[in-house]
Amino acid sequence: MVTAVTPHSGTVNRQYKSSIFAMLFSERKELLKLYNAVNGTSYTDPELLTVNTLENAIYMAVKNDVSFLIGTRLYLYEHQSTWNPNLPLRNLFYVSDLYSAITEERNLYSSKRIQIPTPHFLVFYNGEEKHPDQVVMKLSELYESAEETPELELIVHVLNINQGHNEALLNACRPLREYAAYTAKVRENIKAGYPVREAVEQAVTGCIREGILEEFLRRNRSEAMKVSIYEYDAEKHLRMEREEAREDGYRNGQADG
């Protein structure tokens, strides 16, 4: 097992969580279930995982919900409720900070080779835009000049966890399946016209009653509600920014025409 080093740019996130996904899967027992479901493995010892999520990387531009080490591999898991084609670039910034932390005590100018854990990038998407079960995003797709063999590449696998998508994965991981069900309930309540706070409270109460994330929501009810409201507000802010950008683009196009 690789031991994580506390990052110089932030400590491991043990307190504030920016999302329900981060709250749920920062618990190693639940995170191991998700890892097993994604990779088709059957590990049973949560001690195999070393969580090394950066505490201060929670601002909108560069954040990651959970990063962890297992063996000599580094995994970065994130949920997204809005579609974002810039995920490879964001992950590049984030993993650079992680590698800086992991190698902080080592001499990068040494003649001895410094080995680093192999990275894997995975995003769980549960937004309202329609997308297939899996999408592969590449950093090279963002380059202004396309090259057949780019010298720097980063690949992000985006998995759709909305109803009707990736059912085998959801069936293999109860926490992920119930997380998707909870977020769907919040969204349904908001669409029905409830104020955000009431929509979240009804979703929490309903899920506890129906046995969806029951233990987690009973134990973390107050914090889960606050985080869910924060998540919705952040998602709404991003949607408004995108709509304004589209309107500006349309107006500029009209002016140019």
Label every model-predicted segment:
Residues M1-D256:
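Elongated, amphipathic alpha-helical interaction scaffolds
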